[in-house]
Amino acid sequence: MNNVFVKGLFFFLLLFGFFLKASENPNATLNPSKENVSVEEQKRFGGVLVFARGADGSSMDPALVTDGESYVATGNIYDTLVQFKYGTTEIEPALATSWEISPDGLVYTFHLRKGVYFHQTKYWNKKVEFSAKDVLFSFERQMHKTKRYYSPGAKSYKYWEGMGMSHIIKSIEALDDYTIRFTLNGPEAPFLANLGMDFLSILSKDYADYLAQNNKKDELAKKPVGTGPFKFFLWNKDEKIILLKNQDYWGPKAYLDKVVVRTIPNPSTRALALRTGEIMLMTGPNLNEVEQLEKVPNIVVDKSAGLLASWLSLNTQKKYFNNPLVRLAINHAINVDDYIKVLYEGFAQKMVNPFPPTIWGYNYNIKPYEYDLKKAKELLKQAGYPNGFKTTIFTTATRNPKGAVFIQASLAKIGIDVKIEVYEWGAYLKRTGLGEHEMAFAGWMADIADPDNFLYTLWSKQAASAIPTQNGSFYKSDAFSDLLLKAKRVSDQKEREALYLKAQEIIHKDAPYVPLAYPYSVVPHLSKVKGYKTTGVNVNRFFKVYLEK
């Protein structure tokens, strides 16, 4: 999930291959009766949570976006066939109650949950039950160009294309109203976990058809109708989003009556709003303010090793950066330890490989590029640029301006003159997705706990060809990508791990990026806010959050 942490989306899962069949009776635990709710738990219900983040989302259609800010809303509005248990990396049933996988790994059959209804809102008051036709619509609009829904060329299904889903899935069939069958072109080890990703959320076909018939297709991305624990109420762009509790949710009802998601670009302003009680929970604090926030009696700061990575993309298709010697020189010219001190106040681990060590398959034998200005200058000389060159770095006003200044100063020491170009968030995502940059900051939050989610989605040649791309380095190594494809087709985790270990060696040698940090998740909130978790795959889900009375 891009967010400069792209999610999008993402988060850890204990290999899909262990889940050949889910529980046949998940309703027993997913829908506890009122008699089973303790008096203490009943006290949790009610109240309004005010949550603040630094930037607004770009769409209410989860298939169109990769940025984590958009998923803050859509992740609470929509459901997927399977989901990740809150705060963990474990897969559990969602809109599918159970599934079977054929012995050859090519056929997945899902049994859908009955009695689930799409939201009724002020703009859509029809009571419609979820069924197989909605799954078909949600997938086929991304899979087939003839069923794209939006006007041709108007919108792009970035995640679908970047992950090569049309090459993975051969066909999708509705066997009846409550049974869906996926047939794959070949074994795909992460497939089950991928079905829990936000871009594969299930939308209402009836609602989409209604909008199409009334020439309002664009409203699908502005006024969502899902089956999730919260319903959409209001979106004032760059100001706030309001979500209301879905009283008819198929699973345990949310504790909160309402969630207000505010956009406050300045982190210090967010922190002040937290101090005064104007907001209750915030993301992206100024890390040099965390210590002071922890001293405030009614504020708690949750910290955890996250599933995040942050780096500097070097566009390998641009002049200078198409030379691996230049890319290595840049890596040796940047003191990453100092970068982490300046940017993260120590709330991060030094990045070495494309994904964090909290995911299996991490190559611990690879050592970071050492900070060595003499070596960096020598590499530039070997590349044919003894006096350096001029280039640019893309950043955003709210995301990483301090980091851009640090990189600019570092590269100046080896003769590289860097101009900083600042863009608003939406323009930044568009320009980097099209490859207009030479250098640009990027990041990723794991969508699933599988190396494939980082390596293939962000670094494969296939991803580089899907424009707009998540592969901001436009890295197109055949040797690297071939290993990733082989790993997809193997079900044994040890065999996959061996392939990923080799792939990490190749990308380290090619240096298409500057590894910077594995940031920690740091979330300040009022002490009365309970149940929010910074761990696991699905962050910023509010159905388990409550206000202590």
Where are these regions (language model features)?
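Gly/Pro-rich hinge or "lid" segments in bacterial periplasmic/extracellular proteins
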Residues: 85-86, 166-167, 177-178, 188-254, ...
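Surface-exposed binding/hinge segments that line
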Residues: 111, 143-208
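Detector for C-terminal structural segments
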Residues: 29-33, 189, 236, 245, ...
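A structural "hinge/loop" feature
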Residues: 56-71, 95, 122-126, 191-201, ...
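Aromatic- and charge-enriched surface segment that lines or borders ligand/interaction sites
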Residues: 97-148, 181, 273
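N-terminal lobe/hinge region of extracytoplasmic solute-binding protein
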Residues: 52-104, 140, 147, 225-227
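Ligand-site clamp/hinge motif
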Residues: 215-221, 244-292, 417-419
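Alpha-helical secondary-structure segments
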Residues: 50, 131-137, 177-183, 228-229, ...
